[in-house]
Amino acid sequence: MSPAPACPLERVSRSSAVPAHYDLRDHDVLDGLNRMVKAGKTRYIGISNCFAWQLAQANALAEREGFAKFVSVQGHYNLIFREEEREMVPYCTQENIALTPYSALASGRLSRLPGQNGTKRASEDAYAKFKYDATAEQDNVIIARVAEQAEKHGVTMTEISLAWLLTKVTSPVVGATKLHHVEGAAKAVELQLTGEELAWLEAPYLPHPLAGVMAQNKPNNAKEKHVWSTGDQKIGS
């Protein structure tokens, strides 16, 4: 974000979406974002890593004050981490709020079988390991099903994983550092999985404890260093 000189945006990060541990009932935060919209600095505002009740409170305040409301939410959501389906997905569906999740491929885990040649990031990304290693055994059951579906359709695991996600959200955030990453994401748009195939991919899923940013989304953690910068916070609900 690049705050306009006249806007009281000191409490809003210049480089990221509004962190969830801001008090989103805070009039000044929402007023500052609204001024950005009115000044033409941005057309719409979105939010990342929040609970559905936090988003509901923020938009209720915005509506009452005549401020711009959050029109999209970016959360952690993929085939092996589906906790957003509990409240956020149905809430956003009802309120017509766009879902644009990150970690669509679970840091590459949904693009290849365990043990296959991975990327340098896959071997060195401590934050991704923090998010996924604790549940690897149960997640690998789903990953194996993704591989089986990919073989059946003659496509990549990336295409299967993203095709599943595209049935749930507005548009996923997909990282790409090579041409085939872009090609795989584009092909997923054309891949249509049947209802039976979708259900089969989903069936082994078990509830996951919150990890990373959302595990830290508590009032008493507001002054802690962000989990992605330290990697030492414990997983918890």
What are these regions, as identified by a protein language model?
Residues 51, 77-81, 103-110, 164, ...:
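Glycine-rich beta-alpha junction loops
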Residues 9-11, 147-163:
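Acyl activation and transfer enzymes in specialized metabolism, enriched
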Residues 83-121, 156:
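Aromatic-lined glycan-binding groove of carbohydrate-active enzymes
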Residues 171-181:
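Glycine-rich phosphate-binding active-site loops on the catalytic face of alpha/beta enzymes
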Residues 30-34, 55-59, 89, 143, ...:
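Generic structural signal for well-ordered alpha-helices
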